[in-house]
Amino acid sequence: MLYVIPFIILLVVAIIFIIRQRRQNASSSSHAKNNKNNEIKTSENDLSAAKTPVTIDPNIHERIDHLIDIGHLSAAEALINQTLNRDPSRHDLYLYLLDLHLRQNDELGIKQLIQNLQQLQLHDVLNQIEGKYRNTHEQKEKYAKIIQQKQQNIQDITRTASPTATAAIKVETTHTNPAPVQKHIIEEHQSLEFNPKPIAPVNKSEKSNTVPHQDISFVLEMADQITVSPKKNEAAAEVKVENQTRKLAASPPQALNADQEASHLAQPKVVEPRIDTPPVHTPVPPPTLTRQDTPPITLKQHLPPVAESLQPQPAQITVDHDPLIQAFPELANLDETQLDLELAEQYIELGAYASAQILLNQNESKFSAQQLELSKKLLNRMAS
């Protein structure tokens, strides 16, 4: 009996403990079922939310391009980020982000974009962006090397071509020296003009070089009556008058020769002083008008022969002695303003805004309408 009572007590305690465990298991299973039901409901809600289409502007690319052309790069970047947050499947917009960062030379933004793509595990887009970034970086290095080589070549050419420039200056000075010779010839021609009374005043005009008909006998009579006032030039004046009277009597009608035309071209017009002769009172019988068929008279100027001085000098041919054009003939056909525009654009891509602005401001007056529009776009790019 002593052993039966504790055995019964232990049996009752065991039964009570078993009942409690069953109740706890039942309550835990009910909690698990409730959690499963809640998870199923949340997943169904997520699927329904994913199935609902995201409304995105179909002309998003045109809007982004328009903002980039205007120069509002920050607004374009904000629009791209907003679109990617609403629809992460638009992978082509990541390339737009890369272009914007390259335009702004934002290396930090490019690194953040690459890290974001690595976290999202978008390996295809990441490979495209890394390849494009590598190509643009290589192109910038090539352009920088080309610009440095051009500047070095220009400096070397200017250093080596300085003796040729001095020689060209000397050649131009030698071409301009014959001017005093012409002055000397004109002075000599003026000193050779004799002062006796003219035989007959002849009105010379540029349109007609012929002289009206005159009576030779009257000219000879006037030549006999000529008296020279200065005593020093007596001999020279007499010889000159005789030569003129002979040539007036023997010369056929013809136009002025080539020497006279050359002298008109090389010499200025010399106004001969008109000397009034005193009237001679001689009994003259009334003239009888008889028409004589005499050849027309042409007057010739008698000047001492001057070798090569009376011929018109040919126009001096200006030879371009620019050492750059001699070394690189293709530079003569280049448009400097267009070249400066392209160079300014390269400076902007490299980040040298100050030098690009200097180039655009220097050539603003030389630009055409299209070039002005391009320069305004470049200035907007720098300002943004």
From Swiss-Prot:
UniProt keyword terms in alphabetical order: Cell inner membrane, Cell membrane, Membrane, Transmembrane, Transmembrane helix
Effects seen without this gene: Deletion of the gene results in dispersed T4P localization. It also results in diffuse, cytoplasmic localization of PilG and FimL.
Primary location class: membrane
Topology class, membrane: Single-pass membrane protein
Gene Ontology cellular component terms for the protein in this record: plasma membrane
Cellular localisation: Cell inner membrane
Chain spans, region Disordered: 27-46
Bilayer-spanning residue ranges: 1-21
Job of this protein: Localization determinant of type IV pili (T4P) machinery. Plays a role in regulating T4P positioning by connecting the Pil-Chp chemosensory system to subcellular T4P localization. FimV likely recruits FimL and PilG to the cell membrane where T4P are assembled.
Protein name: Type IV pili machinery localization factor FimV
Species annotation: Acinetobacter baylyi (strain ATCC 33305 / BD413 / ADP1)
Gene for this chain: fimV
